[in-house]
């Protein structure tokens, strides 16, 4: 609590003090280090000054009535390190004139100031009502009602208002200033949707008098508007079964968290997705239209009905070209109109490898057939660019192309492999494409090189549309082959080597006649042997029995149990004695005379036959 004390002075001391003060008195309202004003017609008196050099020794403030009590001087103790003090209302009289000065260690600090309590006062803060009317027409406008501070009704105050975004630091003051006799509402125009704002005000008595303090800010938020720029990312018109499309839209206020409701439809079928975060939603298969609206919207009117119907290819733009713009960080895109004029064109682009939601796009009127894509593009990085014609009944997109802000030298070469020879003995090779992020430009041509031991390297350029090569007229031996790719910036490094080996086929052809002759002789010998087998089989069989032991020519030879050492005895079947036959009638016939045959000459035996011929007894022919 401030310490107030009334100082009693003698008439002579008071006169000297008043004279010294009057000589150094500054008129009221003039700027100076000491500022004093009252707050409201019945408020306190507030004095402030610039910070002093000696903060440890507190100053002392004095004020003296100039109108009602000229002989009374009040002393106010100021706490240390404080550059302001408040004088309660009971220490001065309303509509009085005060003389105020200060000292520190008995020395005067500033020239004394004269304060007229009738005029030199700050009004209290105006009252701002929480009801805010927002108009959603061409632009967002907010209207705020307010009431003036407590003040004599016969006097008019001048009030000023300001507003700002909740997260901003700089205020925007509204013009013109308002007076309390009309109470015109406060209007704020060109507000952003879905944004938090604050508004406050202050008042003053007249121009030249001090302004009152700013009122506590009133916070309000503008409604979320339906997104106007809705587009589709991906292959919405893909028919090969790899359809992957994503509905995307631009966030009107990136710093404000809001969820959306998305509608998809096809004929009489409607699909709703609620609580969808900003700013993407997968597109179900076979949908024909899409609508996006903020989740907190009380009424739904289709704001942007994006058609997803795919039109005929001839309606799409054609001859899409991409080039780098000289002296600009963007990429220039050109195209030609299809068979009919669209409502607008949409050019979208994305960096190679980015997901579907990382898509940028721009809309162009139907008369534009070229554009310079905005943004910062990196050199050597491929960007997929698509130009789409938008019609009332659907979309027609041109095939995507790849563009570069600046083409660089490739970082790698293509891999090469061997195909079946065509014709036999003539190698055929093929190579693949270099990945786009390593190609770093548009391929102008390929170069394949062949190197053999002892010979110089031979290289040949082929078109960038060619990925196979036939290698005729190669001499016999081993080779190494590799392929490089070039852009407008230069030739890249070689790819992996492919080893080739061509054997000498002439040796094989020289040996073929001898090989065929050998086979002919072999076949001839086999034929003759088969023909003579039947003739020699009987004789060979006889001599085999006579000359070879039995255990050799037996079907299953068994030398241990063989009887080859025993005399050869052939078992023959003996004739059976005749049996009595049936009694038959006998007819006598006349016998013919028997003619004796000439005697055969007796066999001549040399004695050698006994070694291997069986005797008649052995044969069982004699009894």
From Swiss-Prot:
Signal sequence bounds: 1-24
GO cellular component, one term: extracellular region
Side Cytoplasmic, residues: 532-623
Tissue/organ expression: Expressed in CD4+ and CD8+ T-cells, B-cells, natural killer cells and macrophages. Highest levels in CD4+ T-cells and natural killer cells. Expression highest in Th0 cells.
Any GO MF annotation of the entry: interleukin-27 receptor activity
Protein location: Membrane
Chain positions of motif Box 1 motif: 552-560
Main location: membrane
Domain notes: The WSXWS motif appears to be necessary for proper protein folding and thereby efficient intracellular transport and cell-surface receptor binding. The box 1 motif is required for JAK interaction and/or activation.
Extracellular topology ranges: 25-510
Family statement: Belongs to the type I cytokine receptor family. Type 2 subfamily.
Residues bearing attached sugar chains per UniProt: 46, 296, 305, 360, 368, 461
Keywords for the protein's UniProt record, in alphabetical order: Glycoprotein, Membrane, Receptor, Repeat, Signal, Transmembrane, Transmembrane helix
Protein name: Interleukin-27 receptor subunit alpha
Transmembrane segments: 511-531
PROSITE patterns for the chain: FN3
Motif (WSXWS motif): 211-215
Matching CDD domains: FN3
Function: Receptor for IL27. Requires IL6ST/GP130 to mediate signal transduction in response to IL27. This signaling system acts through STAT3 and STAT1. Involved in the regulation of Th1-type immune responses. Also appears to be involved in innate defense mechanisms.
Induction field: Down-regulated on differentiation of CD4+ T-cells in both Th1 and TH2 cells.
InterPro entries named in the record: FN3_dom, FN3_sf, Ig-like_fold, Type1_Cytokine_Rcpt_Type2
